[in-house]
Amino acid sequence: MPGMKEIKSRIKSVQSTRQITNAMEIVSTTKFKRYSKLVTESRPYEESMRKILGNIASGVKNEGHPLFDGRKEVKSIAIIVITSDRGLCGSFNSSTLKELEKLVEKNKNKNITIIPFGRKAIDFITKRNYEFSESFSKISPDEMNKIAGEISEEVVEKYNNHIYDEVYVIYNKFISALRYDLTCERIIPITRPEVELNSEYIFEPSTEYILSALLPRFINLQIYQAILNNTASEHSARKNSMSSATDNADEMIKTLNIKYNRNRQSAITQEITEIVGGASAL
C-alpha cells in the first residue's frame, strides 16, 4: 500500500498534468472556433461553385474537357493526404494514415506519388519509404489558401502532362463540434455534377475557355476546403481529447485525495492508540 508521501507526490504530478491538458483544451477551443467559422462561411461559396459547374456540365454533355473526361487506362495516381503537425488528438491522424495505406494497397500495381500535408503524414510516409513530391508542414492560417493554390497548380499541370492519371485527397470533413468524417475522394478527373437545367446557356467567349478557367479554380477550392475541414476537425478532436484527459485527471485527484485522507486518518488513529496504550502501561 503506498505511503502518504508517495500519494502526495502523485497528487502533485496529476495536478501538474491537469494544468497542461486544461491549457491545451482552452487553446484548442479558441482555434476550433476560428476554423469552424471559416469552414461554415466558405461552404456557400463551394456550393455555388459546384452548382455553376453542374449547370455548365449539363449544358455541354457532348463537349469534352481533359479534367472531366478521365483516362481509359490509369497507370499513375497522386494522393494528397492531410494530417496535423501535432498529436494529442486521439485516433485523428492514425485513421487518416490507415485510409492512406488502404488506397495504396488498392492501387499497388500503379505508380503512386503522395503529397503529404502535415508533420504526421510526412513522418509516416518517410518511415515507409513511399514516394512523395513536395511536402507541407507548419502552415499558418494566412498561408493555407496560397498552399492550396500551389498544390492544385502542380496536380493539374501534371495531370495535363499525363504524369498523373488520377488525383485523390484524404482528409477529415468537419461536421460538428463532436463529429468529423474521414473522407477519401477523387478530385481529378472531376465527376460531372448532375443538375436539371431550367434553360439553355449561351457561353461567351467559348465553353472550352470557361471550363479551362473554372475547373482549375474548382480543384483549388476543393483542396483548400479539405485543408480547412481537416484543421477544424483536428482542433475539435484535440479539444475533446484534452477535455476527457482533464476530467480523468480530476477523477484521479479526487481518488488520490480520498486515499491520502484515509491513510492520514489511519496514521492519526494509530498514533492515538499508541499514546493511550503507553499511558495505560504507566
From Swiss-Prot:
Keyword Cell membrane: yes
Entry-linked Gene3D superfamilies: 3.40.1380.10, ATP synthase, gamma subunit, helix hairpin domain
Subcellular location: Cell inner membrane
Record keywords, A-Z: ATP synthesis, Cell inner membrane, Cell membrane, CF(1), Hydrogen ion transport, Ion transport, Membrane, Transport
GO molecular function: ATP binding; proton-transporting ATP synthase activity, rotational mechanism
Topology in membrane: Peripheral membrane protein
One BP annotation, GO: proton motive force-driven ATP synthesis
A Pfam family reported for this protein in Swiss-Prot or TrEMBL: ATP-synt
GO cellular component, one term: plasma membrane
Keyword Transport (UniProt): yes
Disulfide bonds: none
UniProt cross-references to InterPro entries, sorted A to Z: ATP_synth_F1_ATPase_gsu (IPR035968), ATP_synth_F1_gsu (IPR000131), ATP_synth_F1_gsu_CS (IPR023632)
Top-level taxonomic group: Bacteria
PANTHER family referenced in this protein's UniProt entry, alphabetically: ATP SYNTHASE GAMMA CHAIN, ATP SYNTHASE SUBUNIT GAMMA, MITOCHONDRIAL
Job description of the protein: Produces ATP from ADP in the presence of a proton gradient across the membrane. The gamma chain is believed to be important in regulating ATPase activity and the flow of protons through the CF(0) complex.
Membership in a protein family: Belongs to the ATPase gamma chain family.
Oligomeric and partner information: F-type ATPases have 2 components, CF(1) - the catalytic core - and CF(0) - the membrane proton channel. CF(1) has five subunits: alpha(3), beta(3), gamma(1), delta(1), epsilon(1). CF(0) has three main subunits: a, b and c.
Protein name: ATP synthase gamma chain
